[in-house]
Amino acid sequence: MNNVTNIVRRKSTRIYIGNVPIGDGAPIAVQSMVNTRTTDILETVTQINALKKAGVDIVRISIPTMDAAEAFKIIKQQVINTPLVADIHFDYRIALKVAEYGADCLRINPGNIGNNKRIRSVVHCAQDKNISIRIGVNSGSLERDLQKKYDGNPTENVLLESAMRHVDILDKLNFHQFKVSVKSSDVLITIQAYRALASKIDQPLHIGLTEAGALRNGTVKSAMAVGFLLNEGIGDTIRISLATDPIEEVKVAFDILRALRIRAHGINFIACPGCARQEFNVINVVNALEEKVSDITTPMDVSIIGCVVNGPGEALKSTIGVAGARNKSGIYEDGIRQKKRCDNISIIEELERRIRAKSKLLDPNNHNITPTTYNK
């Protein structure tokens, strides 16, 4: 694979969420959100650690009550080296409390956080604690006056007006450590809203399609919206919102970044769908291998082709590849065909062995490593 992207990133200011740089050319950060009850500290910490193992850069936690804020205090003490974004709605006092407890970023929703006085209180607190803010506009919870103005139709214009209203507030307060999102559940509205916002401000943008749906449908819609924006150079952090295990959100996010050659993380599988020419069951091999090496974060290309039509050509471009042949298939490593062929019944085991050996060689300390970038 050509590991250099031609995408020109939109210029933006630099902020930090914990120790993670955002914007101004920093690697695009992957964010997810726990779906546990925050007051269940053990379950929440367990899920955060699982997300971290999957490669997540930033984790968001919903803080709906003061009890949740108190739980957040303990969670923050137990989570090491993973920045936590506190998701705040309705009660601005919760934002003040979690900022005191070490939140790395405050997500506020302009549609329900309250009047300007309350927003100023949150901003002053963030300034005192030197933490960032995300202005998180969402099509499902816009301000009442904007809903009335636009007859309840959450178009890109409504999202943009809501965002700019609060950008102006933060600017007037001389607060610049913030990023902005304008999410809709509609792919085209999301794209149009972010395009418009990107042309008006230079703050980092957090991109995503809100409430995208279940795994398959949500992945397709998110890939369309997020991939389209990334290809235009728009986006500094991403979150794929799926109604499934949040680990899948992280996987899909990295799949999108890898497909656009923006950020390499884990294995890029190249595999044929299988046909009458296949000499081994490609589908079974791919599915089994993908599961077995899901813990590998070292970037590499692995091609699994069931016959000699395209197999050798793909293998020559891959880190590790197999080209199907009768009884024994050809194995390639770094574009070189290996002298010893592999029994077709042992392909899964042989490829896993080679992948793990290559991962250890390329990155001896491969244990939830910080993902690399293609264009770093």
Curated annotation (Swiss-Prot):
Positions of [4Fe-4S] cluster binding: C272, C275, C307, E314
UniProt cross-references to InterPro entries, sorted A to Z: Dihydropteroate_synth-like_sf, IspG_bac, IspG_bac-typ, NO2/SO3_Rdtase_4Fe4S_sf
Example GO molecular function: 4-hydroxy-3-methylbut-2-en-1-yl diphosphate synthase activity (ferredoxin)
UniProt GO BP: isopentenyl diphosphate biosynthetic process, methylerythritol 4-phosphate pathway; terpenoid biosynthetic process
Catalytic activity reported: (2E)-4-hydroxy-3-methylbut-2-enyl diphosphate + oxidized [flavodoxin] + H2O + 2 H(+) = 2-C-methyl-D-erythritol 2,4-cyclic diphosphate + reduced [flavodoxin]
Cofactor note: Binds 1 [4Fe-4S] cluster.
Cofactor(s) the record lists: [4Fe-4S] cluster
NCBIfam families assigned to the protein according to its UniProt record, in alphabetical order: ispG_gcpE, PRK00366.1
Name of the molecule in the record: 4-hydroxy-3-methylbut-2-en-1-yl diphosphate synthase (flavodoxin)
Organism in which the protein naturally occurs: Blochmanniella pennsylvanica (strain BPEN)
Name of the gene this protein is made from: ispG
